C-alpha cells in the first residue's frame, strides 16, 4: 500500500528521516467516539436543523469524519480566524447558532456564537468566561442532555407563568363582582405565587 493510499483514506502521516533519508512513517487515524453518530441523530430529533464541522484538519480527513458521523457540511484546513469568519457569517441568519469547542483557539467562535458550549477544557481560562454552557467531559451525549434540559426548563417556565396569569385573571374577575373578599383574594394570590414557584422547581428533576 502506497503512502498516497493512506492520504486518500484521510489518515495523517508523520515521517522520521535520518540525513534526509526516510526511515519510518507513522500513520495517525482520527477515530470517532462511539457515541458520536447516535448523539448527532438525537440532536436532529430535538430540532437541531443543521450540523456543520469546522476543523483545521486536511480535506481528506475532514471528509471521512463528516461522512462517518453523518455531518451535514464541513469546512477543512481552517485557521481560528477562518472559523470565526464562518460563525460571524452564519449569525446573519435568523436561526440561532450554537458553537461547540474544546480548545483555547475556539474562544473567539464561542464568544460570537449565540450559544457557546465548551467541552472538557472549558473549565480553564478564557474559554470558560465566554461560554454559555460548560460540559465537564468530552461526551457528545452531554450536549444532547444539555439540549433536553433547556427544552424542559423552558417548558416548565412557560407553564408556571401560564398558571400564575390564568389564576390572577380569575381572581380579578371574581373580586370585581364582590364574590370574594379582598383579604381572601390576597391570601389566594400568595398561594398561587407559591404554587407557581413550586411548579417551576420541577425543572430540577433529572432529565434523561
Where are the regions a protein language model picked out?
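Conserved ATP-binding TGD loop and adjacent catalytic N/P-domain core of P-type ATPases
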Residues: 10-159, 167, 197
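Residue-level signature of transmembrane alpha-helix interfaces in integral membrane proteins
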Residues: 86, 184, 194, 206-208
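A cytosolic-side transmembrane-helix exit/cap motif
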Residues: 136, 202-208
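Bilayer-spanning, highly hydrophobic alpha-helical transmembrane segments
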Residues: 158-190
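Hydrophobic transmembrane alpha-helical segments of multi-pass transport and channel proteins
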Residues: 166, 190-201
Amino acid at each position: 500500500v502506497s503512502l498516497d493510499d493512506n492520504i486518500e483514506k484521510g489518515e495523517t502521516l508523520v515521517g522520521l528521516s535520518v540525513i534526509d533519508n526516510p526511515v519510518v512513517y507513522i500513520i495517525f487515524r482520527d477515530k470517532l467516539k462511539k457515541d458520536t453518530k447516535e448523539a448527532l441523530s438525537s440532536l436532529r430529533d430535538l430540532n437541531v436543523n443543521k450540523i456543520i464541522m469546522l476543523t483545521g484538519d486536511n480535506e481528506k480527513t475532514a471528509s471521512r469524519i463528516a461522512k462517518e458521523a453523518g455531518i451535514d457540511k464541513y469546512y477543512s484546513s481552517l485557521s481560528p480566524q477562518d472559523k470565526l469568519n464562518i460563525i460571524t457569517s452564519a449569525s446573519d441568519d435568523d436561526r440561532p447558532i450554537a458553537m461547540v469547542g474544546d480548545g483555547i483557539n475556539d474562544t473567539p467562535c464561542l464568544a460570537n456564537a449565540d450559544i457557546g458550549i465548551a467541552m472538557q477544557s472549558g473549565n480553564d481560562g478564557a474559554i470558560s468566561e465566554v461560554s454559555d454552557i460548560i460540559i465537564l467531559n468530552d461526551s457528545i451525549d452531554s450536549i444532547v442532555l444539555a439540549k433536553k434540559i433547556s427544552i424542559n426548563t423552558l417548558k416548565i417556565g412557560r407553564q408556571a407563568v401560564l398558571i400564575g396569569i390564568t389564576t390572577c385573571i380569575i381572581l380579578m374577575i371574581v373580586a370585581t363582582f364582590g364574590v370574594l373578599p379582598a383579604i381572601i383574594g390576597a391570601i389566594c394570590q400568595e398561594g398561587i405565587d407559591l404554587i407557581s414557584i413550586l411548579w417551576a422547581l420541577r425543572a430540577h428533576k433529572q432529565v434523561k
